[in-house]
Structure formats: C-alpha cells, structure tokens
Amino acid sequence: KSSILVLKMKKVLFVLFFFTLLSSNSSAEFTFVQTKNVALDTPGIRGINFKPDGTRMYITNRYDDQKAYMIEYSLSKPFDISTATISFTGGKPKGTALACDGAGGDDHMELPHAIEFKPDGTRVFVTTNKDFSGNPGVAVFQFRLSTPWDSTTLVCEKIYEVDVTDSGKNPPDEDQVRTLAFKPDGTRMFVGGKAEHKIRQYDLATPFDLRSGVTPGGISGALSSADNNMRNIQFNPDGTQLFIAGNQNTRMNKYNLSTAYDITTLSSSFTTFDLGSRTNNMMGFIFASNFTKLFVTSDDGNNDDSGNDNQIHEYEI
C-alpha cells in the first residue's frame, strides 16, 4: 500500500511540475531531441498527429504541388520518430488519397493541412485551403475509418465549408484554413487561417460529426501582431491555454483563456517559446504523449539538397 501511495504522489508531483513549467515565462521547456527526414516519402509535408499510444504517426502530404494524401507510419518504440517505418508499400505518390465526392470537378482533396482524430480513431478531420466551390470554399473534410486508426480504410463523409466571412475586412474572406482543434468531448471545433489571423469556433450538435447541427459560436480577435501565418493550434488538457505557431518565425506562443475552450475569451497577451532555427519553415505541430512531447513538421519548399525539406522535429517538455 505504501509503495502504491508513493507512486500516486510522484504522478501528482509530476503533473504539478509540468504545468508550473508551462505557466512560466522561460523558453527552456522545449528540449530538442532529434529530426527525422521524410523527403523520400513526401514532397510536401504539412500536418502531423499520432495514435494516443504512440505506435502510429500520420502526416498530410501534398503531391504534385497540391494533391492531398495521408501517410501512416508504424513506430516500434512509442513516440520515438527514429523508429517510424512507413506503412505504405506502393509506388508514388505514397499514402492514402484524400478524396470526397462533391469537391467540384475533381473529387481529390487539395492543399491539406492539419489532422485531428476522434479519440477512438473512427473519424479523422483534415483542413484544406483549396477553393473548390467559391465563396470562399475553404473547408474541413470529415472521413470515417472502418478500421480505427487505419488510414487506408478512410471513407469521406462530409465536406464542411467554413464560414469565414468578415464584413469588416477587405477582401472580406479568409483565403486559407490551416489550423484545427476540437474540444475533447467533440462538441466544439476550432479553425484558424492565414489572411485574417483569427480563430473561429463552431458548436457541434453531434460530437465529432460535421454532417449536421454545426453552429458558428464566436471568433477571436486578430492575432496578426504575433501569429500572422498560423500553421496549427492546440489547447492544453483543461482548455485554459492555447498554443499557436506558424512559419513566419521560429516561435510558439501561448495564450490564456478566461473560460475554457471559449475562443472569445482569448487573452491579448501571450508567452513566447523559441523552438530554434530548424523550425524556420514550420508546416504543422502536435503535442503528444500526455503533453510531454512536441512534434513539428517543416519544409522549406525548395526540394533541393539543402537538407531542409520535409522534416519532423521531436522535442521533450
């Protein structure tokens, strides 16, 4: 009994220590571990996510400049990207095509970005900034996975066009939707883009389902002073902090929310963490392993021999 009590106390102390670190202003919370180059697998890495147990990793891939694919990796050691092996064994392009009837004349999704899964792995959501229908056409694609966490079994269920109209801006519409996050219970979705530098929230009548009952629920103020080229967003576990990063610089910014998971209460001030020059061309990021690890994707877009193309960077917290 005493040993069990000691273990429980250690877990409590670890959690308290971790949240104390993230609440501080120091930039030393993120320790670089390693980089994995996936240029042989993808010419255009974007979003990244993991299965909760760390045994699978997923990235979105832009092939032939725009066409969208999802590439899945198996990890022999959870959350250790050096052990990641691509699951796809065919030719090029690698990965599972992201396609959906109704996306204009071509049903193949284009310009993919962030990836978010339903917690049980039976649904996956991907943002796109492809204007396939106009006015403005940026959207979140919803896919069902007939086998949980197996991206080769995905089937499109819905293209949810994001309402990004802003009458106070000229031009009035967001031109790129890149970021994506959900409230843990699936009743609220958050998206952000490039042109307006704002984050929008939507209430979902059915958790993790965009097919009906989606209601706009508020919008943040403009974040252009610090986050004017967002690539992804992620909340801390209790929804009182929001992390934002993009490819305008090498920083990650942390904002507070006075009401959990309510983007309209996002603070105007923020804390900055510098991730180093390796993230100069950030394309996406994800916290994983109970918020003890951070993974960042980057691509300089040159497709040359510089070594800066299509990389995944691992950090410990």
Where are the predicted features?
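Sec-dependent N-terminal signal peptides
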Residues: V12-L22
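Surface-exposed loop and turn segments in beta-propeller and other repeat-based domains
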Residues: Q34-D41, T85-D107, V155-P172, V214-A226, ...
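Short loop/turn segments immediately following beta-strands, especially the blade-tip
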Residues: E72-A84, F143-T153, Q201-S212, Y255-T265, ...
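Residue-level detector of Asp-centered blade-edge/turn motifs that repeat once per structural unit
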Residues: F50-D53, P119-D120, P184-D185, P237-D238, ...
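Short glycine/acidic-enriched loop and turn motifs that connect beta-strands
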Residues: Y63-K67, K130-N135, A195-K198, Q248-R251, ...
